Amino acid sequence: MQVQLISEVSEFEALAGEWDALLERAVVPSLFLSWVWQRTWWQYLGNGQLALITVRDDAGNLVGIAPLFRQTADGLHELSLVGCVDVSDYLDLIVDGCCVEPVYRAVWDCLSGPHAPSWVEMNLCHLPLSSPTPAI
């Protein structure tokens, strides 16, 4: 698996077509996870630093996205799902059904690795009941 941490809006924008194609194959598809919704939310309501994590298989196909951002509250760095504050329901990681465990493992390795943004808390709000995220 190839993992990339994205912090620039231009890189976020470049994912549009691949993002929605992945969402069609996702374990938990949701309007609130579509590229248009996520990008619009970030543009108008997002604050902090983007920390999107993309995961690609060995052939370069996008198989996972952790749509995260980092903000600071009371001096502590928190990672949250894009859309987590105000308006959005049914948020989650976007994971191709063929690769659930390897994608989650790759995301966790990225978040706990030396190049990860510093954080002490993760806010995974509005997860649907069908999400595999809490179990993994």
Question: Over which residues does each language-model region extend?
Answer:
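N-acyltransferase acceptor-side catalytic subdomain
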Residues: 1-136
